[in-house]
């Protein structure tokens, strides 16, 4: 048994905080303008009608309505359906 810990053992022991990514409002849920719908890295979901994209690829509602997920041109898109 070694009486010393080893060369690199004290250099370990760090961990980063979770980034809390993912879908925050799901399909059919009602959102207000400015509410965050998806937090993501890269464009897993693309912005559709009444949806904006932030500098960190976060999708947010541009107007109040209900969230709708769909596919357009082979891409997953998020739309906000405004009640008539």
Swiss-Prot record:
Keyword annotations for this protein, in alphabetical order, are: Ribonucleoprotein, Ribosomal protein
Q: Which InterPro entries match?
A: Ribosomal_bL27, Ribosomal_bL27_CS
Name of one Pfam family that matches: Ribosomal_L27
Q: Name one GO cellular component term.
A: cytosolic large ribosomal subunit
Q: Tell me, which GO biological process terms does this entry list?
A: translation
Q: Which domain of life is it from?
A: Bacteria
UniProt biased composition (Polar residues): 7-19
Region (Disordered) residue ranges read: 1-21
A GO MF term: structural constituent of ribosome
The record's similarity note reads: Belongs to the bacterial ribosomal protein bL27 family.
HAMAP family xrefs: Ribosomal_bL27 (MF_00539)
Output this protein's name.
Large ribosomal subunit protein bL27
Which species expresses this protein natively?
Answer: Clavibacter michiganensis subsp. michiganensis (strain NCPPB 382)
From the broadest rank down, the organism's phylogenetic lineage runs: Bacteria, Bacillati, Actinomycetota, Actinomycetes, Micrococcales
Query: Which gene produces this protein?
Result: rpmA
């Amino acid at each position: 048994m070694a009486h010393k810990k080893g060369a690199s053992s004290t250099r370990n022991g760090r961990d980063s905080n979770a980034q809390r990514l993912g879908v925050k409002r799901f399909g059919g849920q009602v959102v207000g303008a400015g509410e965050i719908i998806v937090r993501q890295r890269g464009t897993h979901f693309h912005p559709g009608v009444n949806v904006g994209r932030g500098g960190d690829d976060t999708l947010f509602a541009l107007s109040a309505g209900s969230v709708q997920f769909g596919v357009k041109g082979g891409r997953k898109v998020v739309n906000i359906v405004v009640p008539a």
